[in-house]
Amino acid sequence: MVYISNGQVLDGQSRSPWRLSFLTDMFWGITDFVVMFFQSIIHPNVTRRGCQNSSSSTRYDDGRGPPGHPRRMGRINHGSGPSAPPMAGGGGUGR
């Protein structure tokens, strides 16, 4: 990469890729990766910002609460005994 320093055009290729700052950045990058890898195995809810399951970061912060039970569709059927006869006319009490 070309850049200007003190009025001179310098080519970035002349810099060594094994300079000390690169090596320390690489070391800390690998160290952070290894630490976060093992922390995620031991405590899966931990991220770089902290625990994700804290009480302040729940899904229902807006006061609605969790959703209710699913609604029933169709007839109510409790599964006990025969169903009631139809309500059409026919034999009754006046015979």
From Swiss-Prot:
Protein name: Selenoprotein K
Pfam families associated with the record: SelK_SelG
Keyword Endoplasmic reticulum: yes
Sequence intervals crossing the membrane: 20-42
Signal peptide feature range: none
Primary localization: endoplasmic reticulum
UniProt-annotated stretches for the region Disordered: 47-95
Compartments, record wording: Endoplasmic reticulum membrane; Cell membrane
Membrane topology qualifier: Single-pass membrane protein
GO cellular component terms, semicolon-separated: endoplasmic reticulum; endoplasmic reticulum membrane; Golgi apparatus; plasma membrane
Keywords of this entry: Calcium, Calcium transport, Cell membrane, Endoplasmic reticulum, Ion transport, Membrane, Selenocysteine, Transmembrane, Transmembrane helix, Transport
